[in-house]
């Protein structure tokens, strides 16, 4: 027994990049299917990330943030809900081109599933 459904975009792999691709695709109006073999979305951020996984934020030579988008959106939502710590830059690396932001990976996974529902993926 089978059924047929048509999609505009099929994303294979629900790691961090696949999650971002599926959300972006749906937000741009494409009927999107995300396929993940493990049943848990997030890849390194969920299945093999250490407790208190850190977002590394990269900055350019002028000190402006280079990385943002959907992953940054997840960080901001987790921070607002109390499941992430504010970004931190090591005092001994004051001019470092990155900061760290620690999040709870279990809550990140829950948020990603919530975002999939919000976007109809």
Describe these PLM feature segments:
Residues 24, 30-31, 37-121:
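Conserved N-terminal/central alpha/beta ligand/cofactor-binding core
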Residues 3-17:
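Beta1/beta-strand and adjacent pyrophosphate-binding region of the FAD-binding site
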Residues 1, 5-7, 112, 116:
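FAD-binding core/adjacent interface of flavoenzyme oxidoreductases
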Residues 8-9, 31-33:
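Structural motif
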Residues 17, 21-26:
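Small-residue (primarily alanine) positions within well-ordered alpha-helices
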Residues 12, 36-37:
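A secondary-structure boundary/capping signal
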